[in-house]
């Protein structure tokens, strides 16, 4: 398995190469040069696997044996998921009205990102220790990514992590999960802007090849292929758990998956699984920040003038950068076309998809947009019907379930991306109550540490100097 850039300028890279990369040198994102195919026979053979076992099978498709041997791979996955609070790391809950919810939030920071982040961090540690090297991780977050990334590398001597979050645009718990991480290898910045504003200097820093090489700078955002790879496993797990049977022959039942969508990494993983041969009907669900919905419906891939703050802050995103991977997949790997499209979008923040590409997109993906009122409505109804509380992001998917009956002969799954415990304001707005677990209650009592990125500051230069100071400290 080799990897290439979505913009055609880089080919033939190893898994290790892309693991330690942010964006490719040409500004693109890494993808497998060829996707493996999953036959009906293979899916049947995986039917009784646990999530952990299935994840190993998936990773083996994309990580050659000579890079991480199977025995070591199994050990890394097992160790990565050892701190999750349920036995198999994920849990499927089946409720009234054919509502099935795949809970992906049982990691230490109570968000689905813990699954891919913990595995990716263990893969990093494997190579860094083997090669006796160090790395600096640079991460921008809209809420959940930052704390998950910090937790995955907390205290590792081989890694420093720099995390930037948008001040005032995430929940208090999300902020405290980052700022109370005062380990020597953790560096947290609060920026006076949106998560999309944060992405701009980060992309520029990753485009500086000399900076990346000198400081071994890398990303744990979903620009990192490893995150997408791991996320493909929960789509496969949902399919194998919820399809009633896999009859002999090549005709397989369909599973509809409703996916809360922000940066589009999760929905990209779903599309990859679909392209590998699994019959998924994918629905990207967004909040008022509806660029993905508009793109699917009309081909209008254009940013709004500002990011709207909603009750689902982790998907308050107007620049869903993983859509570049989707465009590359659907164009048949036409990197030159993707390069042209994305350079236009990055320059003007507006793009009208070519008709053929929009048609391809609308054939593989449906979409919907939900207001804050709809989020609260879904939270209330799910509680009233089931005494089951969902977070506002999960509610974006569950709202669609309540509005649209399941098609005859099909099954459906809603992806639960975070625990409701992290979103007390939304829970209270819905007229519901939820007692915080002790791990969150104590956050207010802990020491915090955070640096500022003010509107008047040069964010790129400030972060560049900090990255250089980290390397200087290491080498002293």
Swiss-Prot record:
Q: Which SUPFAM superfamilies match?
A: Tryptophan synthase beta subunit-like PLP-dependent enzymes
Q: Which key words are in the record?
A: Lyase, Pyridoxal phosphate
- Recorded GO MF terms: lyase activity; pyridoxal phosphate binding
Q: Which domain of life is it from?
A: Eukaryota
Sites of the modification N6-(pyridoxal phosphate)lysine? Answer: 113
**Signal sequence, start to end:** none
Matches recorded under Gene3D superfamilies: 3.40.50.1100, Threonine synthase, N-terminal domain
BP term (GO), one: larval locomotory behavior
Q: What is its EC number?
A: 4.2.3.-
According to its UniProt record, which cofactors does this protein need?
A: pyridoxal 5'-phosphate
| Principal EC category | lyase
**Pfam families per record:** Thr_synth_N (PF14821)
* Alphabetized CDD domains for the sequence: Thr-synth_2
Query: Which family is annotated?
Result: Belongs to the threonine synthase family.
As for what it does, the entry says: Acts as a catabolic phospho-lyase on both gamma- and beta-phosphorylated substrates. Degrades O-phospho-threonine (PThr) to alpha-ketobutyrate, ammonia and phosphate.
Q: What is this protein called?
A: Threonine synthase-like 2
- By which gene is this protein encoded? thnsl2
């Amino acid at each position: 398995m080799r990897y290439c850039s979505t913009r055609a300028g880089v080919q033939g890279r190893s898994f290790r190469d892309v693991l330690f990369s942010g964006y490719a040198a040409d500004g693109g994102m890494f993808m497998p040069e060829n996707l493996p195919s999953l036959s009906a026979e293979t899916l049947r053979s995986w039917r009784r696997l646990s999530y952990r076992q299935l994840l190993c099978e998936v990773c083996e498709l994309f990580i050659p044996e000579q890079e991480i041997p199977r025995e070591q791979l199994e050990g890394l996955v097992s160790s990565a998921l050892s701190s999750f609070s349920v036995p198999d790391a994920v849990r499927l809950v089946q409720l009234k009205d054919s509502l099935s919810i795949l809970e992906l939030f049982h990691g230490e920071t109570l968000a689905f990102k813990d699954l891919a982040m913990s595995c990716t961090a263990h893969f990093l540690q494997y190579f860094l220790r083997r090669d006796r090297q160090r790395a600096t991780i640079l991460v921008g977050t809209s809420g959940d990514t930052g704390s998950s990334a910090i937790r995955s590398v907390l205290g590792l001597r081989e890694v420093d992590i720099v995390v930037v979050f948008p001040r005032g645009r995430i929940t208090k718990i999300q902020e405290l999960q980052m700022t109370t991480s005062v380990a020597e290898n953790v560096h947290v910045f609060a920026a006076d802007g949106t998560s999309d504003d944060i992405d701009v200097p980060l992309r520029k820093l990753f485009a500086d090849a000399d900076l990346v090489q000198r400081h071994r700078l890398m990303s744990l955002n979903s620009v990192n292929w490893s995150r997408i790879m791991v996320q493909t496993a929960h789509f496969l797990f949902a399919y194998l758990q919820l399809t009633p049977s896999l009859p002999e022959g090549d005709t397989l039942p369909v599973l509809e998956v409703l996916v809360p969508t922000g940066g589009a990494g999760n929905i990209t993983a779903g599309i990859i699984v679909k392209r590998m041969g699994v019959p998924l009907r994918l629905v990207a669900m967004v909040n008022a920040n509806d660029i993905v919905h508009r793109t699917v419906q009309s081909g209008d891939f254009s940013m709004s003038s500002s990011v709207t703050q909603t009750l689902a802050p982790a998907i308050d995103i107007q620049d869903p950068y993983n859509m570049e991977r989707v465009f590359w997949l659907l164009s048949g790997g036409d990197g030159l076309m993707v390069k042209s499209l994305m350079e236009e979008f990055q320059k003007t923040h507006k793009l009208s998809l070519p008709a053929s590409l929009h048609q391809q997109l609308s054939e593989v993906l449906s979409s919907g947009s939900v207001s804050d009122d709809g989020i609260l409505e879904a939270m209330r109804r799910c509680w009233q019907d089931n005494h089951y509380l969902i977070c506002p992001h999960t509610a974006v998917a569950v709202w669609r379930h309540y509005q649209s009956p399941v098609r005859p002969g099909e099954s459906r799954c809603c992806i639960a991306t975070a625990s409701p415990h992290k979103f007390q304001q939304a829970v209270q707005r819905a007229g519901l109550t939820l007692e915080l677990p002790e791990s969150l209650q104590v956050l207010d009592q802990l020491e915090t540490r955070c640096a500022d990125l003010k509107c008047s500051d040069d964010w790129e230069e400030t972060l560049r100097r900090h990255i250089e100071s980290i390397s200087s400290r290491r080498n002293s």
